[in-house]
A protein has these predicted regions:
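Domain-terminus/edge residues, biased toward the C-terminal soluble/receptor-binding domains
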Residues: 169-172, 177, 182-264
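Domain-scale selection of a single, long terminal region
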Residues: 1-9, 18, 244-245, 259-264
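Active-site-adjacent loops and short helices of periplasmic peptidoglycan-processing enzymes
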Residues: 3-176, 183-186
């Protein structure tokens, strides 16, 4: 399916962070939050945010949870994962439901790194589920591990649902929690590196572009897009901001549940 990610109305280029001055932010209409690596969540619209479907931003949780169990260095490909009938069925199901997919075949071997890149960049739902099942043995065991992981981040209003992709609306979160998850992604070296890529090369299909078309604009170096009928437009953005000649900070924003992807 063709996907246009949300463009946040928070202008990273104009943001001024200071310990002496409050930050004036023109908030979007949707639930929104802002944070930094150093300080966590520093501002949010509507403190009493209600959990809403996270859509594909849940894939950040998937990859971070898997890397807790199966860490990879920046240049490592990791183990080869052999696709089986269940993996093919996942592809067929997501494809039939209009979800983002990448074709797989029984007996095909895909490295852990390729599964991660296919999950984060073109946002393949079947790759996310296959990665989680390979790592934990089942989606239920993945769900338990991921739930424990997000709690360790302080994302206490995030619930991991029935899949690892976020396609099912049972995975829910808040903009506040998505900023915490985005900070975790920005501080994980491999995830930060992968998020910054505009495209990846994958088995059989070749080059696939990132859904995050904001990369390289206004300081954006990463993040994750999300969009479903139930979730609306969801976006976690990671940007770098030079605040002094010697200091650069990483800013994470989250916009959740806007009426459409383009309005988020």
């Amino acid at each position: 399916m063709t996907y246009t990610p949300p463009e946040p109305k928070l202008d990273i280029a104009e943001l001024r962070l200071s310990t002496q001055k409050a930050v004036a932010i023109a908030w979007p209409s949707a639930p929104t939050a802002l944070g930094t690596e150093e300080n966590g969540v520093i501002a949010q619209k509507d403190v009493a945010q209600s959990p809403q479907p996270s859509a594909s931003t849940a894939k950040l949780i998937t990859v971070l949870t898997v890397l807790q169990k199966h860490p990879l260095g920046l240049t490592e490909q990791g183990p080869l994962v052999t696709m089986n009938d269940d993996d093919v069925e996942r592809y067929n199901r997501y494809y039939s439901e209009g979800g983002s997919t990448i074709t797989v075949h029984r007996g095909q071997q895909i490295s852990q790194r390729q599964l991660i890149e296919g999950t984060l960049l073109p946002s393949a739902n079947n790759y996310a589920d296959s990665l989680a099942v390979w790592s934990f043995g089942s989606l239920e065991k993945y769900r338990q591990a991921a739930q424990k992981y997000v709690r360790s981040l302080g994302a206490n209003r995030t619930t991991i649902g029935s899949d690892a992709s976020g396609f099912d609306p049972s995975t829910t979160s808040t903009a506040h929690d998505l900023v915490l998850i985005g900070i975790a992604a920005a501080t994980q070296p491999l995830v930060r590196t992968v998020m910054a890529k505009k495209s990846t090369e994958l088995p059989i299909i070749g080059k696939k572009d990132s859904t995050n078309w904001l990369l390289g604009t206004n300081g954006f170096i990463g993040g994750k897009t999300g969009n479903t009928d139930q979730a609306g437009g969801v976006f976690v953005g990671v940007a770098e901001k030079q605040i002094t000649s010697q200091k650069k900070i990483t800013i994470v924003t989250a916009v959740q549940g806007d009426k459409s992807v383009n309005q988020a």
